[in-house]
């Protein structure tokens, strides 16, 4: 419950930040326009983001005839989770990774790279897909889509404010130094809020996935293996579209420095430690 309250507060914060920047650009009218833009972007993301992401990664839908073992695994786990059967996709990429997408459990899809199927055992793969189905069950896809959309919009609005200036409530030019400061700091604040949302949801999906599979140790082993393999194998599509990195079970980006500082994923070691504690105690709370 605490994680859901925290997520709601963070979502409110990122929306408020977007509206404040709109106000700096155009006063009260700018705030109204920013709110309308935010609603429009989120509406579009809600209905079409899954199709865009799957097309972006050239994901190919599979079924019981084209990928029987993988498909049956997802179906069994979906039944255990009391979820509708999602669409199942494969991505021809060497890096081991996986993600879920779709606006709700009735319109969900799960995708895995061919690399992850080669690297993981069947038991570990069950742990990974249970994690992705937990994202579906928790409706994390909607949350992550909105937060990513808002973070990107904040960055775009901040750049607009820096280059074109802003207006105060009376329509007069705003303080240019304040505008530059907001333009520089707002995208960082947006990224930090998005990071906090994503990290909280990853921990919840690890816990939920362990409950679905009944085998937290399998997911812990899978995360360890994915972490070791993924760091040495580039994922070109993810590098070209870094905003989608938060969807993956493991950060697919190869960059270091600030990119790691603002990673949308918790430390793998901490995730594994939590899962191993679940395995030791048999408790998932």
Curated annotation (Swiss-Prot):
Main location group: membrane
Cofactor annotation comment: Binds 1 zinc ion per subunit.
GO molecular function: metalloendopeptidase activity; zinc ion binding
Needed co-factor(s): Zn(2+)
Compartment(s): Cell inner membrane
GO biological process entries: proteolysis
Residue ranges of the TM segments: 7-27, 30-50, 146-166, 177-197
Active site positions, chain numbering: 132
EC supergroup of this enzyme: hydrolase
EC number(s) on file: 3.4.24.-
GO annotation, cellular component aspect: plasma membrane
Annotated binding of Zn(2+), by residue: 131, 135, 202
Record's keyword terms, sorted: Cell inner membrane, Cell membrane, Hydrolase, Membrane, Metal-binding, Metalloprotease, Protease, Transmembrane, Transmembrane helix, Zinc
Membrane topology: Multi-pass membrane protein
NCBIfam families: PRK01345.1 (NF002363), PRK03001.1 (NF002826)
Family: Belongs to the peptidase M48B family.
Protein name as catalogued: Protease HtpX homolog
């Amino acid at each position: 419950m605490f994680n859901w309250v925290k997520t709601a507060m963070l979502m409110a914060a990122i929306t408020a930040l977007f509206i404040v920047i709109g106000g700096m650009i155009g006063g009260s009218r700018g705030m109204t326009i920013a709110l309308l833009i935010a609603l429009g972007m989120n509406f579009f993301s809600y209905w079409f983001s899954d199709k865009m992401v799957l097309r972006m990664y050239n994901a190919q839908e599979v079924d019981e005839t084209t990928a029987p073992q993988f498909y049956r695994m997802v179906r069994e786990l979906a039944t255990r989770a009391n979820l509708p059967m999602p669409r199942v996709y494969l991505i021809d990429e060497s890096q081991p990774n996986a993600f879920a997408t779709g606006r709700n459990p009735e319109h969900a899809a799960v995708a895995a790279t061919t690399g992850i199927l080669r690297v993981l055992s069947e038991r570990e793969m069950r742990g990974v897909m249970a994690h992705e189905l937990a994202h579906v069950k928790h409706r994390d896809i909607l949350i992550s889509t909105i937060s990513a959309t808002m973070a990107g919009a904040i960055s775009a609005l901040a750049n607009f404010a820096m280059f074109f200036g802003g207006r105060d409530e009376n329509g007069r030019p705003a303080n240019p130094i304040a505008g530059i400061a907001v333009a520089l700091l707002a995208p960082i604040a947006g990224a930090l809020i998005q990071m906090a949302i994503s990290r909280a949801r990853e921990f919840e999906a690890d816990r939920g996935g362990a409950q679905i599979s009944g085998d937290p140790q399998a997911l812990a082993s899978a995360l360890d293996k994915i972490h070791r393999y993924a760091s040495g194998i580039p994922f070109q599509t993810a590098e070209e579209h870094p905003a989608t990195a938060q969807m993956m079970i493991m950060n697919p980006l190869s960059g270091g420095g600030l990119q790691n500082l603002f990673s949308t994923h918790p430390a793998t070691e901490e995730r594994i430690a939590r899962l191993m504690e679940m395995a030791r105690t048999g408790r998932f709370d």
